From Swiss-Prot:
Lineage: Bacteria, Pseudomonadati, Chlamydiota, Chlamydiia, Chlamydiales
Cellular component aspect of the GO annotation: cytosolic large ribosomal subunit
GO MF annotations, alphabetized: 5S rRNA binding; structural constituent of ribosome
UniProt superkingdom: Bacteria
Gene name of this polypeptide: rplY
TM ranges: none
Organism of provenance: Chlamydia abortus (strain DSM 27085 / S26/3)
Name this polypeptide is given: Large ribosomal subunit protein bL25
PANTHER family in the cross-refs: RIBOSOMAL PROTEIN L25/GLN-TRNA SYNTHETASE, ANTI-CODON-BINDING DOMAIN-CONTAINING PROTEIN, RIBOSOMAL PROTEIN L25_GLN-TRNA SYNTHETASE, ANTI-CODON-BINDING DOMAIN-CONTAINING PROTEIN
Similarity-based family: Belongs to the bacterial ribosomal protein bL25 family. CTC subfamily.
GO biological process: translation
Functional summary from the UniProt entry: This is one of the proteins that binds to the 5S RNA in the ribosome where it forms part of the central protuberance.
Amino acid sequence: MELVVTSRETDKKSLLKKIRQTGGIPAVIYSGGKSLANIVVDAHVFSKFLSSLESGALSSTIFSLSYEGRTIKALVKDIQYHVTSYRVIHLDFEELIEDRDVKLKIPIRCINAVDCVGVKLGGSLRQVIRALRVVCKPKDIVPYLELDVRSLGLSQTRKLSDIQIPAGLRPITPLKEVAVTVSRR
């Protein structure tokens, strides 16, 4: 996803409020744990993109931020929402550097849920863990991981170890944990 961002000068509450009122989202780009730049993201463009994403996919989406004539590859590390309107009010981006490891959550998609044996027998499929925490290089980031649940019967489970994890990803979450279960209704 490409975003054109502009620089902003200050962290004063009154100016941040003004940015939000004029259709912007205050944001910060971090690099190596330190603040690299204070920026403004177009609220309309970002909200439209956010609404088109599948649930959980934001954590593994790589953004190309066009900033002062250069392009910065980054992940959203934190997002803040307004309490009542649920509008995005602040973003934190983490710059991706080729040779540096990054920690992130990659969403888990259950595939073949319609053909699941346990569901056909009247069970209920429940996804216990929706994302796997991993460490990897930016080039190894994948949008999601798949877990096939077709052969899952009643009262059976699938663990994180049943997921085919690409070579460059190193899981942080223990793989012995249950990811999906089919229970009797």
